[in-house]
Amino acid sequence: MADRGLPSEAPVVTTSPAGPPSDGPMQRLLASLAGLRQPPTPTAETANGADDPAFLATAKLRAAMAAFLLSGTAIAPADARDCWRPLLEHLCALHRAHGLPETALLAENLPGLLVHRLVVALPEAPDQAFREMEVIKDTILAVTGSDTSHALDSAGLRTAAALGPVRVRQCAVEWIDRWQTVTKSCLAMSPRTSIEALGETSLKMAPVPLGQPSANLTTPAYSLLFPAPFVQEGLRFLALVSNRVTLFSAHLQRIDDATLTPLTRALFTLALVDEYLTTPERGAVVPPPLLAQFQHTVREIDPAIMIPPLEANKMVRSREEVRVSTALSRVSPRSACAPPGTLMARVRTDVAVFDPDVPFLSSSALAVFQPAVSSLLQLGEQPSAGAQQRLLALLQQTWTLIQNTNSPSVVINTLIDAGFTPSHCTHYLSALEGFLAAGVPARTPTGHGLGEVQQLFGCIALAGSNVFGLAREYGYYANYVKTFRRVQGASEHTHGRLCEAVGLSGGVLSQTLARIMGPAVPTEHLASLRRALVGEFETAERRFSSGQPSLLRETALIWIDVYGQTHWDITPTTPATPLSALLPVGQPSHAPSVHLAAATQIRFPALEGIHPNVLADPGFVPYVLALVVGDALRATCSAAYLPRPVEFALRVLAWARDFGLGYLPTVEGHRTKLGALITLLEPAARGGLGPTMQMADNIEQLLRELYVISRGAVEQLRPLVQLQPPPPPEVGTSLLLISMYALAARGVLQDLAERADPLIRQLEDAIVLLRLHMRTLSAFFECRFESDGRRLYAVVGDTPDRLGPWPPEAMGDAVSQYCSMYHDAKRALVASLASLRSVITETTAHLGVCDELAAQVSHEDNVLAVVRREIHGFLSVVSGIHARASKLLSGDQVPGFCFMGQFLARWRRLSACYQAARAAAGPEPVAEFVQELHDTWKGLQTERAVVVAPLVSSADQRAAAIREVMAHAPEDAPPQSPAADRVVLTSRRDLGAWGDYSLGPLGQTTAVPDSVDLSRQGLAVTLSMDWLLMNELLRVTDGVFRASAFRPLAGPESPRDLEVRDAGNSLPAPMPMDAQKPEAYGHGPRQADREGAPHSNTPVEDDEMIPEDTVAPPTDLPLTSYQ
């Protein structure tokens, strides 16, 4: 039927791709109504014909309203305010002129129908989001004001319709006000927006279930506005804010749980700070109540969990362990690292911390100790029987709860209570990926891979990581459907190897996510909106058409069906007229010749020209479906996925959808399918984003369903007329499908390349760092190290030149930190390899899909084949990079640490046997110690017999390695003199050596000599004499003793002795009899020369009261030994 006015290419008017077009649905409706405002007077020749001007005006009016209802283009608030008054005026005038139920329904419900099309995009900033919502509120108030009610009253129309001004104003304004209140309350509790406001009350907040804050905004009272864009955007913004509060409040319950051990509470606090209270711009911001609580908790921790600094310096440390150790040592959750050379205790991370007889961790939250768990998972160590039973009990209980619940809040609380926070899940996945990437299962017994503990950790971490990822956006809004589909589709590809190892591949993980985090379907909301529209149509039909069905009822319901299908993946459940029921039964209303004559009048883009009685005849329906739907299929399938061709195809699809509207029933939902096809193709006409593979599949499915309808109509007409059916929509014959699939496949390839590019850069950076650290450590341990007893020197060559010196603890800490940098680079390499592996898996699956599509095209050099070759080339490059980079993870040992590891292993065995021999009561441990010594010596002799490989680095390279590793370690300053480093111990330092002293005077009592006159006259003479008081005598004696124990520093100023005061004696010091004669005490002139000298009996510094000749020069101990 291409000769009936359907051009292969028609001129089109392009629209702006940015934002709603200036010629939007509201402007087009306004232009159509303005043209129909004054209908022409019917003439005698066309009084009763199909070309009656009144009939044509009515048909055009209904077509304009149908186009507005079915349009998927959004309307800007400014356009709505500008067009509202004239649009309502034209509608009321046309209703007065025609009295149609459609004009009444559209005028009465236009505020609600307009609100459902207002475009809104809320920014992430709360202030801007509130301003945008205020713009929507002002627009709604403008279109539902008193002017609107007055205009409707003047035209004899209702203002209290379901989507009328009264209901919409009340419902929309109430919803926006409530949304603002709820959102502001959530922002007040959100740790991201109000960290400083988190006080004692906030730290005691009750848990907030996921999605609860938006529950009052999705009640049936707001069903009529639920699909509106401002409602959907508001729910999305509120979900992003409230979900953070939900996760924060669930985590907050554990930091002060009295049933947990102090270490467990402290670890939960650190995880809380790292997860919610740390930002790249400001670092960790800890509220004072939380800081005080953490300090109190740390003081209760058993010190046995910490390893002493000197012993900890010998161990390789991870960044996460350093974070925990530093925070516990400094009693501050802000501390994340220690300065180089700092001696600091280290928290234990060995598997023994999980033993049941060690009360460090609570059994209900063992997974919160992330450094210990990561070490357990990555190294594959076998815990003790008690520790394994304890871990399995927690893991099995947690996994069972996850598998047997459908509540997101229950799953989130279960994960966090067990210690599986979002960051911990990521770390555990990285550890398990590192275990698999390093080939660790090859070292396990034959037939074994991951252990039972590792498998359960992997299952919970995989589910938890995806649950937390979805929980950040979980909500009752349409965009969450796309988010869930994306995460669900990638869940088993991101960690494909691990999913297979733990038994979650093959759709198990995706089904678990669908059961827990699947989007809620607004079936009841859409059903309520449908019932409200049906009720409005019935009301208008009773008032203005004597109860006859309105010709736009089906159109309004198609709008709802298309929205549910394209936004929520809801298949319309409204029963359509089956194609078999349209066959004429009995005597047809019109002869076949009438049908044929009317069929010849079907031309694009005309919607009129056929009498309504013929359109309403069921016998004419197959002609319309065969011709109109067939032409729409031909135009669509032959259009390339480019703006101009697709825009022409959209015009043909809209014509097919609106043809016979009001007279011709919908058959097999053909209008719904055409509307959904228009919605899916509209982005291409606006030059928007490219198609996706899912979109291409949906369009192909819709085309196939329309083809079935059209071909069925052709088969019904075959006895009467021979019509050429449209070609089936195959990839090999449809330009639209092959171009869509090619663009979609290219888009997937581009997304994969964009994901792979930073991963490869990370791989490159990690490999470069690994190479540098490997060479540096190898050269570092090729050096010789010498000691003078308390300092270490590095000898890089045969010359006697040495580098250093450094304190042993500083060198140990520097080596430990440099090895941590090596392990950080190795972990980054493992994470990048795991992510790149997921890209390879997705690319392989995508290549298989493209192979199937390319096989449907007969000619070889088609666009799909080109894209397939590009995908294959990309897969080859990425797979090669992955294979080569994976070889770097084949070893366990830090390069350069091989011999050091052997030495430490032998030393630990000898130390353990030696300790056992010392504590042994029998000869067996001693014999074992001797045997261990023999074996160690024999091994050393065997190694020495092997020819030692020459050094691979030069002296300059070794010196550079020393400087690189020890860059931040402070060098030990050389001593001032050889004597300064020497301490001579004599009997004077031994407080228990009393053999050289006579203890007799200490036991004698005081006796008054006979020469003392105790008479009154004698005492009077005695008291009038000058006396040396006891306090002065003791002060001088103490000064002499102390000064002899110190050696004065070289220089004009000598060290000042410490003054000892008797703080327990409250009696005042005795005053001398002659306070004006300081010379009587032997050092009066020295004190008299001092300005403002105190009284002779007033306590002063000891060194100033000691005569110079009584201060003996110290000979044995420097002053610095006491400091």
Curated annotation (Swiss-Prot):
Region of interest (Interaction with large tegument protein), ranges: 568-1123
Cysteines joined through disulfide linkages: none
Catalytic function, reaction form: L-asparaginyl-[protein] + H2O = L-aspartyl-[protein] + NH4(+); L-glutaminyl-[protein] + H2O = L-glutamyl-[protein] + NH4(+)
Compartments where found: Virion tegument; Host cytoplasm; Host nucleus; Host Golgi apparatus, Host trans-Golgi network
EC numbers, comma separated: 3.5.1.-, 3.5.1.44
Keyword Hydrolase: yes
Record's function text: Plays an essential role in cytoplasmic secondary envelopment during viral egress. Interacts with the capsid via the large tegument protein/LTP and participates in its transport to the host trans-Golgi network (TGN) where secondary envelopment occurs. Modulates tegumentation and capsid accumulation at the viral assembly complex. Plays a role in microtubule-based retrograde axonal transport to promote neuroinvasion. Also plays a role in the inhibition of host immune response by acting as a viral deamidase. Deamidates host RIGI on two asparagines which becomes unable to sense viral dsRNA.
Protein name in the entry: Inner tegument protein
UniProt source species: Human herpesvirus 1 (strain 17) (HHV-1)
